[in-house]
Amino acid sequence: KIEYDDLWLGAAHSQMFDVKTLNINPSVAWRAHEKLSLGFGLNWQRGKMKYDRLAGVGAGGFENVKAKVDLDDDAWGWNGGLLYEPSPTMRIGLSYRSEVKYHMTGDVSLQSDGSAAGNALLAGLVGAGYQSKLKSTVSLPGTFIISVAQQLSDRWEMLGDISRTGWSSINNFDIDHSSGLRDGQRAQRIDADFRDAWRIAFGANYKYNDQWKLKYGIAYDQTPVKRSSTRMTQLPDNDRVWLSFGTQWTPNKASRLDLGLAYVFIRDARINKTITTVPHGYNGGTVSGKYEGNLWVLGAQYSQSF
């Protein structure tokens, strides 16, 4: 989720963009050989997107009307993998998580700021059919991962993985009217023009005793954004480097608690993005500048076996 001040200079690009997914992934595994295990799973996902922006820039009250988009859908995907153990101290894993295609539906509501210009424009836009049901199709990318784990001693284990995510499945994110006077017409196109992206990670586990394990890691995560002219205010992403530390507590054979902390160095992201494909003929203007920021990420996971 990303939020801006309501009246920031790029408000006709976005004021708020929020995407949430819920994934339920039942899976089965089969030990085909003493050195080879296979796994397969189905993924049911629930996706929701909320998107707010000004109607546009320029004269005529467009900066006095907000458009609020709300879309959702259910979708299915699958995942599979194998684990090969060439020796008692080495494991090699291959896995793939499929692309998931959403056919999202919802609506757009228009709101005036209460000014005379805003109220007049709102009445005109509603009368012309711009407040309506919406539909959009988007494919979330598939990911392929190769991983290796090597036991160096009774206490130390080295880890590494490389993954490729098919972000090029998202070229344009088109939102279309699906009811009323504008049925079948384009409401907005969000130009993404993503590329496939790589992630490379290395790590180590240190077994302090039978109950406690310490974890260390570093990762390089490539952005799918190609250049400043295709970087979106909805996703001002750039390349990242992760430094992480964690611990695992295993009080008994059936319980496990993992805690992790990561600091993410994000490369400064320049943007020079112009939006001209808004339906009423007024453009969204150009946003030009630079995003700066780093992240702290805290995670916790508890596992219970039965």
Model-derived features with residue positions:
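Outer-membrane beta-barrel porins/channels
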Residues: 1-306
